[in-house]
């Protein structure tokens, strides 16, 4: 009985780790964690989740405000 319970919790934990890794961002973090180089994660969202904080916007995005440090809030062009 204890072996079944341990196996269940192990598989449950592995499922959430795989889901977190496949999303591309660190799921569950309310605040962006700086990388060792001091830069913030590219996947940080801005403008109520409609944009992404980046150093430079992609070709199909336009700058729409500022994020932390010297990052731009980039939104998709419509």
From Swiss-Prot:
Q: Where in the cell is it found?
A: Secreted
Q: Which UniProt keywords apply?
A: Antibiotic, Antimicrobial, Defensin, Disulfide bond, Secreted, Signal
| Stretches of the chain forming a coiled coil according to its record | none
Q: Name one GO biological process term.
A: innate immune response
One cellular component term (GO) for this entry is:
extracellular region
Please name the InterPro entries in this protein's record.
Beta_defensin_dom
Q: Which residues form the signal peptide?
A: 1-27
Disulphide bridges, residue numbers: 43-74, 53-67, 57-73
Source domain of life? Eukaryota
The entry's family comment says: Belongs to the beta-defensin family.
Q: What does this protein do?
A: Has antimicrobial activity.
Q: What is this protein called?
A: Beta-defensin 105A
Species for this entry: Pan troglodytes
Source organism lineage?
Eukaryota, Metazoa, Chordata, Craniata, Vertebrata
